[in-house]
Amino acid sequence: MKFGFYSCMSGMPWGGSEVLWARTARLLQLDGYEVTANYKWWAYKAEPLAHLEKHGATVCYRDKPAKPLLKRIFSSNGAKQNWLESERPDAVLVTLGYHPDQILIADECRRLGIPYGINIQCASNFFFIHSDRLDDYRQWYRDAERVFFVSEENQLKLENNIAMKFENAEIIANPFNVDFDAAPAWPSTSDGFRIALVGRVHFQSKGHDIIVDVMKQEKWRKRNLKVCFYGHDQGNKRQLTELIKMHQLEDQMEFVGYSDKVESIWEDNHALLLPSRYEGAPLVVIEAMLCNRIAITTAIGRNRELIDDNESGFIASGATIDLLDDALERAWEKRDQWEQMGQLAGEHIRQRYPKDPIREFADKITSLAKAPAVG
């Protein structure tokens, strides 16, 4: 049996939205299934794709740069065959990094009678589908055997966006990058409290700019609290570092850079600060809670499902200066309880989140192949 994985990722060579399908594909290989994938061509090949190919997967790279005319005419390969027609997978998973992504591959699945599922990694209220395209989007989702969301909040956003109830929806979990039983030591508070924003430096989604506006207030300047930023630059590192300098916040804020050592981050920090404007289900919240740290975050994605406000973390009802300031103020008032609250967060996340999301999702993908053909 063969499973196909189609990624709509087009803005960068790799991203967090790709982790679930790639790890699931690898697990299916280990289970003895064949795997084929369709991914946008980049000059840089992401390591997970190379890993799948090394273990026998066929990967079709679409949108390759056009060859010179003579080379195209005399190419021994000729025109590339349609991916689905040549590979004939028994089922296909289509992954969207963001809800506006078009799902044209669904039309081909329907034409060939191949059952498919759709996984939406992030939906927001920042982009609404134009009414001229509603029928297309509704058809793509309606014909899917299953539509997988990473949070109930994201499902509601997309239902409102295209004015359609998803009768075929299911909530799934993304994999995390820390041991399920992680227990990094609680850092000393003798030099004050350190809170970390872990995530790409992208103001539009992560809200770094909101943190600057909160921390530049006089009351926060006087408090023994430091915000540390961890993550890759995705377009706004320069603004972040220059805002810190502009407001003379060098003592209160620091850009640390990217680190893949999750437990080490939480050995140095007491809490997560994440004022996201939109998310699917932020893994950094799950990882912080698994490391027995509280999260101070917004009511987006899966956060309300995982965090009990004022008990195992602090939730701002929206990504605004005033609302984040309120949540951070509530947290600061209980700063001497953060360690105990973090322990409670660790207990809650282990009760509310699966230990092995990849195995659970792999089982759902294999069930797609047993579904009636679409079309």
Predicted regions and their residues:
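Glycosyltransferase donor-sugar binding loop
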Residues: 37-45, 198-199, 226-239
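A conserved mid-protein helix/loop that constitutes part of the nucleotide-sugar donor-binding site
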Residues: 15-23, 193, 202-217, 322
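Nucleotide-activated donor-binding/catalytic signature segment of Leloir-type glycosyltransferases, i.e.
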Residues: 240-257
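A short, well-ordered alpha-helix in the C-terminal region of glycosyltransferases
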Residues: 323, 330, 337-352, 363
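Aromatic "clamp/platform" in nucleotide-sugar-dependent glycosyltransferases that forms part
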Residues: 258, 277
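Conserved acidic donor-binding segment of nucleotide-sugar-dependent glycosyltransferases
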Residues: 308-310, 314-322, 330-335
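Short hydrophobic beta-strand element within catalytic cores of glycosyltransferases
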Residues: 294-297, 307
